[in-house]
Amino acid sequence: MADNDNEDVIMDDLVEEYVETEEENFVDSEEESEDKSEDKDEIVESPSICEGFVQASSQTLVIIPDNERITSNVLTTFEATRLVAVRAQQLAINGSTMLKKKYSSPIDIAKQELFNRKIPLLVMRCIKVTPEGQKIVEIWNPREMGIPLLD
């Protein structure tokens, strides 16, 4: 995991979905708003920043070791699309490409980086949030995962 410290991380809550209702969005002037950022997907720059982010939201990040992972080693279509979107956004603001061949658009470059297994991003899958406030996650490198076909 030490060689991936400079790579971006995408958090994806696969197990627990968060559904907001109008009542949950309403905040009375006397009440304080609860921090709901723990249940939403977040994009952060590196795992170390991610740890700071999760600790700032009163949670501790627990990373499952690679040999004890419980989720599938195949990217979901959502994860693959999100990886391409995040990478295309980076490339659109003058990010450097990992490919030698020239492509016309950031989306094409991001797709080729994903399919060539050169995309410099990580996928963080939230497994569970314990009552004690610990967030149990798996960090996957897309280079070691199966990739679905994208149009």
Curated annotation (Swiss-Prot):
It holds the Pfam family RNA_pol_Rpb6. Residues 20-44 have a biased composition (Acidic residues). GO terms for cellular component: DNA-directed RNA polymerase complex; host cell cytoplasm; virion component. It is found in: Host cytoplasm; Virion. The keyword Transcription applies. InterPro entries: DNA-dir_RNA_polK_14-18kDa_CS, Pol_omega/Rpo6/RPB6, RPB6/omega-like_sf, Rpo6/Rpb6. Gene3D superfamilies: 3.90.940.10. GO terms for biological process: transcription by RNA polymerase I; transcription by RNA polymerase II; tRNA transcription by RNA polymerase III. GO terms for molecular function: DNA binding; DNA-directed RNA polymerase activity. Residues 20-46 are annotated as: Disordered. Keywords: DNA-directed RNA polymerase, Host cytoplasm, Transcription, Virion. SMART domains: RNA_pol_Rpb6. It comes from the Viruses. Belongs to the archaeal RpoK/eukaryotic RPB6 RNA polymerase subunit family. Part of the viral DNA-directed RNA polymerase that consists of 8 polII-like subunits (RPB1, RPB2, RPB3, RPB5, RPB6, RPB7, RPB9, RPB10), a capping enzyme and a termination factor. Component of the DNA-directed RNA polymerase (RNAP) that catalyzes the transcription in the cytoplasm of viral DNA into RNA using the four ribonucleoside triphosphates as substrates. This is DNA-directed RNA polymerase RPB6 homolog. It comes from African swine fever virus (isolate Tick/Malawi/Lil 20-1/1983) (ASFV).
